[in-house]
């Protein structure tokens, strides 16, 4: 992993200052849907309303505003409470997570501004400096410069980015264009939620933490570019609502259903063991409850794997609905990048938003 060269200041356990961890502190999907139900029908304001290609009504990863026939702005924001104890790693993870929404839409980040909340007393500002440097390091890796930001006094530390990117409006990847026959490819392993929960409790092995941090700080840039070149038009990134929750949103928007083969889903090292030991976040429990009635999990799927399918992820991979003819070559390209990409299922005709999870692919 890349390192931040600035001298580190002794820090308390940052995860002890947070009631949640990473994207597990998101408002639960059920509450978010309730909130936005009251906003449906509100008109987009201003003369550019007709050029708003993706907005709140679509529930996608980012907003998209067309500038002209060849350029569209992609705007997103994401921030969260500490997910790890190392300040620079937290900054790097939060930045990669925020940038991911631009990649999920098929865009490239241009610039960002910091969003930070920090206690006015009791936590050294030098620690926030390490967080910001970590975020700037990953943004620079993405070719995205950080142009200032905003801070507030808050007893619970929070950090993230508001990101502006650029995309071709004719080549956007959105959640509403998956079609039956598309092959579902996941580009990163899942399990960051159980690792973060165990870390917060001081029970995560160091090698497991290291693997999770490496995954969470890995940009989705290469995966996004490969997907665009393969002709993918339906995608999302897997974060706080878990794999099944984000798939459900894609399916509901696309008026389709899906099959998932649990044995094909890549898991982070140690994730199954931690799930089996009961390190399950409140966000994951909320995800599981929200998917009741939408996710039919075969009883033969191991209980810990079923948990991980709902596990609240932070800076997860892209979930791509790839055209059948393009899927094999796309999978090869992703694996050549060193990604643990896997074909985990397919889109099928069926009840909108529903997912059937089977133990393994039947030949």
Region spans (language model):
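Small-aliphatic-rich amphipathic alpha-helix that forms the alpha element of a beta-alpha
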Residues: 87-113, 130-141, 219-234, 238, ...
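N-terminal glycine-rich phosphate/pyrophosphate-binding loops that anchor nucleotide-derived ligands
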Residues: 2-104, 144, 179-185, 189, ...
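A generic local secondary-structure boundary/capping motif
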Residues: 52-54, 62-65, 100-103, 136, ...
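Acidic-glycine-rich active-site phosphate/pyrophosphate-binding loop
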Residues: 63-74, 217-223, 288-299
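Buried hydrophobic positions in well-ordered alpha/beta secondary-structure cores of metabolic enzymes
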Residues: 23, 64, 98, 106, ...
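Active-site glycine-rich loop that binds ribose-phosphate moieties when present
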Residues: 162-172, 207-227, 301
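Glycine-/charge-enriched secondary-structure boundary and capping motifs
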Residues: 1-20, 31-35, 46, 50, ...
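Glycine-rich anion-binding loops of enzyme active sites
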Residues: 68-84, 89-92, 108-205, 346, ...
